[in-house]
Amino acid sequence: MWTDAPRHETDDDLAVTLRSLDLFAGLPSHELDELATRCDVSSAHPGQVIQAQDVPVRLWHVIVGGHAVVQRDGTPIGLLARGDTWSEHSLLNGLPSPTAVVALSPLTLLTLSRRQFFEIPEQHPVLAGRLVARSATSADRLALLV
């Protein structure tokens, strides 16, 4: 199973990275700076499982570099790239992930724990709205409908 790698970027570098991603576009600088202090930087190598299928979702990730595949029962159902996230629906609802996410190339990820993820609505209301919208169309929610 995948584990966190040591943090290699400063909070300032992370804030710059967040600003460059569509999900965080237009958020106030002070919110991005604060969010950057909460994010961990992690990495994965090709073939590494980032989220296993049928396992509770405990972390929320944003891809900042590389590509991953979303699989259900070993069958690819989607691709993820820079700026993509997954499992919002499962994380929000305390459900096991109906899909697996596997690195296709070396990945760099920004990661929040489930507890940190649940702090977003209070501290970052605009971002919270965007995440709820993404949850409605996330691969893990759509996989439940199949």
What do these predicted ranges mean?
Residues 1-146:
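Cytosolic regulatory regions built on CNB/CRP/Popeye-like sensor folds
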